[in-house]
Amino acid sequence: MAIGYACLNIGTPNTNIRSVMQRNATAEKLTEVITHNLEALEKMVDYNIANGIRLYRISSDLIPFGSSPVNMLDWPETHKEVFDRIGTKIRRGSMRVSFHPGQYTVLNSPDEDVVARAILDLAYHDKMLECLGVDNKNKIVLHVGGIYGDKEAALDRFAENFQRLPESVQNRLIIENDDRLYNSEEVLELTNRLQIPSVFDNLHHAINPPPSGGDDRYWIAAAAKTWKARDGKQKIHYSQQAPGKRPGAHTDTIQLDTFQQFYNQLDDPTIDIMLEVKDKNLSAIKCQNATTANPRPVLLEKEWGRYKYAVLERSPAIYQAIRTLLKDKETYPVHELYRLIDTAFAEELCPGYAENAAAHVWGYFKKHATNAERRQYEKNLANYRNNTGTLATMKRQLFKLAEKYDSDYLLQSLYFYLE
């Protein structure tokens, strides 16, 4: 089993994916952004390997205008060396990667121009996977598309246009149920017709269930039959509904108890689970730690090291409770740890607590800082106290000091990344 996350990474410096406005998309600018994005991807792949994450969805924005005539660069050849290097890391790390083209990639549109662009976009995604040198177990996820007044005709049109795709794209394509138009049963019928895999999404299913009924367990088992050996391990999507938000809105983090209940009822606990959640890799590690076959206290201590100053600035009481919790090296209190962390992040930020946490972080530098750096810190602190400055300003200085003084421990701290 692998538990993964999508596109962006929280807490790893310089992993943002950049974009380009069309009016600025010169060859020079495109090359600059592609180079940056590939460097960011490599950092995220390195992070995944270091943290045992073997399932990852790459951003479709990796190559700006990758399927458009706006980008006429021979980017596969120009960046071949870095693609090869990243692909080698992915394969050696037993990582499975995927793409999920966006809402404008619609294969069943009645508009031929839209379909033509969709075919080009799917070919672009396939080309990126080809550049990485990964096999057909690394997939491209797509929704069916629109209904256009006639669902049966729309499904037929998808099937017809599927045959127009290059064989390499057909071999990678998998179809997901959505939260409005095509339910689990309809997607399953289509994928059986095309002999390609079906991806079950639990939240979409909860919002848009088929009239025939059936719980998650039933439809996951049904979808499993569409996955052949050549496709790799069955993959599903898992997310939780954000309270008070529109149906389908994802939570900030995965509530572990709810996930554990879902996981425990799976017939096959070895399937791959792609999390769709706002805190990305943080929830992936949370769920990994809860389901690992080798529960070691060091796993929790490692994660606590990243969270602790972010927790301290919200609740010193919870900070102390977690320190006490982890003192017992004979237990593995994964659920209690994350329950306490989630409780801390649900609390309002208190200026006094934030000042205390900043002082702890400043303590890493005060023996090395120059007089100018010390004066700047004291000025930022005074401004924050009298409401003429912000906590963000103080944190920016502390982050720059962490970079200057090579404090890798602090650079990995979620104190700088979570609000």
Where are the model-predicted features located?
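Eukaryote-skewed repeat-based solenoidal scaffolds used as protein-protein interaction platforms
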Residues: 124-193, 203
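Conserved protein kinase catalytic core
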Residues: 106, 149, 182, 207, ...
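Alpha/beta catalytic barrel-like cores
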Residues: 1-95, 105-108, 113-118, 127-134, ...
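Residue-level marker for buried hydrophobic side chains located in beta-strands
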Residues: 97, 173, 198-201
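Short hydrophobic/aromatic-enriched beta-strand-loop microsegments
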Residues: 195-202, 292-297
